Amino acid sequence: MVGPEDAGACSGRNPKLLPVPAPDPVGQDRKVIRATGGFGGGVGAVEPPEEADEEEEADEEEETPPRQLLQRYLAAAGEQLEPGLCYCPLPAGQAGAPPPSAAPRSDACLLGSGSKHRGAEVADGRAPRHEGMTNGDSGFLPGRDCRDLEEARGLARAGGRESRRRRPYGRLRLEGPGDEDADGAGSPSDWASPLEDPLRSCCLVAADAQEPEGAGSDSGDSPASSCSSSEDSEQRGVGAGGPEEGAPPATSAERTNGGAEPRLGFSDIHFNSRNTFQVSRGQSARDHLPPAGPPVPLPAAEQGPAGASARARRSGGFADFFTRNLFPKRTKELKSVVHSAPGWKLFGKVPPRENLQKTSKIIQQEYEARTGRTCKPPPQSSRRKNFEFEPLSTTALILEDRPSNLPAKSVEEALRHRQEYDEMVAEAKKREIKEAHKRKRIMKERFKQEENIASAMVIWINEILPNWEVMRSTRRVRELWWQGLPPSVRGKVWSLAVGNELNITPELYEIFLSRAKERWKSFSETSSENDTEGVSVADREASLELIKLDISRTFPSLYIFQKGGPYHDVLHSILGAYTCYRPDVGYVQGMSFIAAVLILNLEEADAFIAFANLLNKPCQLAFFRVDHSMMLKYFATFEVFFEENLSKLFLHFKSYSLTPDIYLIDWIFTLYSKSLPLDLACRVWDVFCRDGEEFLFRTGLGILRLYEDILLQMDFIHIAQFLTKLPEDITSEKLFSCIAAIQMQNSTKKWTQVFASVMKDIKEGDKNSSPALKS
């Protein structure tokens, strides 16, 4: 942006206008811009005739202002113009003058014939034909041309101050800021053409070049005259006697500041686009100026606050005016490095804007700054908030008064509501504190359990497993076993505890697996023949369809054994290989849960070995082979210990004729892996591997003891449903504390002794008091 301080030495009132060389754009046609089009050949230059395309001619016709506008604007030029600025003839012998035979062409001059001559300003034999320029005209010249201009003007200042201020009569008086108190008649210098009004309104007066009061200036020469710094410096030089003879002419900067800091001036005017121009402050920027002496003090009239406000008024319109473009001619030259903002729409066209990419955030910020509004996301409806908001407790409730459309509460009612609200909040806080303590206690127990598992893992790995056969029956190992096996050694301990009495090898597993795959391929072909021939139930249960159906229902919450899960194929392979290994047993519903627990803790081949040996145990073999007589013996033995430990609940079950087979079959078939949480079922498996089948029935008694009070309040249907689907919030500590309270001795007889006596009684046909056997 150009400010008043950038005018400098080039803002003289009556400078001699020198021609400005036309720009020579690279890669384009050389062309001198007309007087109405820009600075290509200086003000008043005429483009030499040449051919132009239709588009350029249309633009020129549209953009060229009226002839009278230029005449009125340049009517102030009264000094000698250099060649190339007009067609007026020059004195013979002068450079650029036409030959003597040529007739004068004063009628062709763009400045018109109304120019006034001032003989007192004749210098160098030149006859001036035009009046002086205004302050704004000289501001369009580059700095170097201004300095040459002032050197040429130095010879034309001997005529005195009054002669230099002469103006043609018949012009309008210019009243800029600060002219309110001037004389109504004014001096001749206060008259100018109507087009000078915007220029004179700038009232540019260099602050450090003002004349003190009484130094030969009249009242009409103060703000309205708008003298430049160069003219005032020359006036001081004349008053002092002028420069010494023989001394070289001083530069504009030296005459302006007396050798101090050079004045700022216009320089390097560039054309960027239509109706726009650019001013590069390469020469006027203070960071490029050489160091100078102390600044020239301001006059006394402008040192106070009133002078500062006057300077602000005088300089306020200068920058605003020069941002407008009075020369809309498009120039063909390279784009300047410095980009300018688009100019004003002066002659009907708007300059093209540069296609600058703006992000949505910048556009939103500009819109908000322009409109004063901020964009906020649309608020959600209150109905949706009411559905989504669910307070965790009554502490989220806020006590509010009644709406304004309802009668106000009385004092007693308001106090009662406040008291009730405080009680509700207090109860809610107590409940939350209790729950927080409970969660904290559970976390402490979990951390303690993890620490115990970590310490036990070291003992199992370093001491017990290397000496398994020696230490497995020791009291220390049995106590560690009861507390639960560390997950890292659980699979290994299970394999050692179950053993491999069947001597199954991984190679044997691969053989049975390949047979199972062949059987699955031929299953679709032989299924119809098997149905007609009447195959056994075991063969039908070993079919692929039954295995697939049971696998999809194995631990459905884990989503690892279903189709597409990581262990689906492994589980399918183990079950299929076992049906080929034991066709007499085949596949029974519930085997998938046992195989799945083994897969989670062992490798595929080791899981198959443990699975086959585990199902080969007497109790599992009797249940999976559906040996009804053996199953009744296990139920009778269970009832003996049931009556011994839970006599009250035993009588309650007996009153409803609730036999053990209703709830024990599912527990024994799946080894509690389906009825209990998985981590609790694994701990049951740990002790089952240590104690054998006895612990399975002891665990059943522990579950009945845990829910004894609840079961005593239920009838037959609800008891059966409850025991089939146990609660999920059961904890290992509570369950194992109830299991530990079960005594597996009846009249100094242990489980094995009681089971043997039951079998003997059945063989002898003796009377048996078991409700299951009676039925």
UniProtKB/Swiss-Prot annotation:
Keyword rRNA-binding: no
InterPro entries the UniProt entry points to: Rab-GAP-TBC_dom (IPR000195), Rab-GAP_TBC_sf (IPR035969), Rab_GAP_TBC_domain (IPR050302)
Bias type Basic and acidic residues, positions: 118-132, 144-162
Region (Disordered): 1-66, 94-312
Residues where Phosphoserine is found: S284, S315, S747
GO biological process, one term: regulation of autophagosome assembly
Pfam families (UniProt xref): RabGAP-TBC
Feature: compositional bias, Acidic residues: 48-63
Family annotation (PANTHER family): RAB GTPASE-ACTIVATING PROTEIN 1-LIKE (PTHR47219), TBC1 DOMAIN FAMILY MEMBER 12 ISOFORM X1 (PTHR47219:SF15)
Complex formation: Interacts with RAB11A; this interaction recruits TBC1D12 to RAB11A-positive recycling endosomes.
Residue span, Rab-GAP TBC domain: 484-692
Residue spans of biased composition, Polar residues class: 270-283
GO CC terms: autophagosome; recycling endosome
Keywords: Acetylation, Coiled coil, Endosome, GTPase activation, Phosphoprotein
SUPFAM superfamilies assigned: Ypt/Rab-GAP domain of gyp1p
Positions carrying N-acetylmethionine: M1
Function summary: RAB11A-binding protein that plays a role in neurite outgrowth.
Phosphothreonine found at: T748
Native source species: Homo sapiens (Human)
Coiled-coil annotated residue ranges, if any: 409-452
Disulfide bond residue pairs: none
Transmembrane segments: none
GO molecular function, one term: GTPase activator activity
Chain intervals with Low complexity compositional bias: 212-230
Localization of this protein: Endosome
Name of the protein in its database record: TBC1 domain family member 12
